């Protein structure tokens, strides 16, 4: 019985697939092939005579009219119109182009060639050997009330919610971690050095991601231990897992957010002052955290610009005193900037300062 049902589903699926292919082919034939046939039947070059370099006389049949045209490299001139003479061959061609049977045969020859047949046959054979669970239906939504009063959803629904939440990972990574501060500081460093394309964006983003995971490792580990592991062992519900997982991120963001920004967005949201930091809602904390991160990144960038700005001023003054006003100062100052950055071990100094700025 199960085998009969399985083959019935496979047969129905194959029928739908073949029907779809035939329908799409008919659409292609209807809007493309017929137009080509009609255009070819309306116009035909009967004969042509070459008179010289890029000079020809051409006789063209357009439906029942025969035209004599003079053609050069620059223009086409209508010379004469011959009497309307329709040859039997031309009549047969027009009759064929308007005949339904001819169109059908031409369509079959065009679309159902050997390559098309082989492709459809291979696809049908592949679908015949698909496992039966490929045709399984969508499971029902099942939920029940837990002992603590919460609602527990079935595993397929939980999986669907989890896969859907993966689309928000880039937003979480950009707005709720240390990534924004790091990547802005690296971009400002590149501008201060005077090398707008080196290191390239891919390297800066990759280095920022690595440092983000390094800095956020304790928070991610706590989320894994307190939220994911109990949920994977069915000890807590998905609602409890989300609440537990948000607490470490909430604490991290609160510690990096300025009090002024929190008060500003709380005022915009018409919320009074909070007695405890844990009571701050995410809709207030998230914009406050982003604003604080931007301000901190610009402050770090300002301190990075100062030594390189001094080098630019010194080089410009020297060039002006030597009368070399046509020489770009950035060309001369770039080697000195790179030498200074390498001598002070700039990468290690900058990465150390960025890491310590999150755990001061």
Curated annotation (Swiss-Prot):
Topological type in the membrane: Multi-pass membrane protein
Residue spans crossing the bilayer: 10-28, 115-137, 152-174, 203-220, 297-319, 332-351
GO cellular component, one term: bacterial-type flagellum basal body
Keyword check for Cell membrane: yes
Compartments in which it is found: Cell membrane; Bacterial flagellum basal body
Keywords attached to this entry: Bacterial flagellum, Bacterial flagellum biogenesis, Bacterial flagellum protein export, Cell membrane, Membrane, Protein transport, Transmembrane, Transmembrane helix, Transport
GO terms, biological process: bacterial-type flagellum organization; protein secretion
Alphabetical list of NCBIfam families matching this protein: FliO_TIGR, fliP, PRK12797.1
Function: Plays a role in the flagellum-specific transport system.
Homology family: Belongs to the FliP/MopC/SpaP family.
Name of this protein: Flagellar biosynthetic protein FliP
The encoding gene: fliP
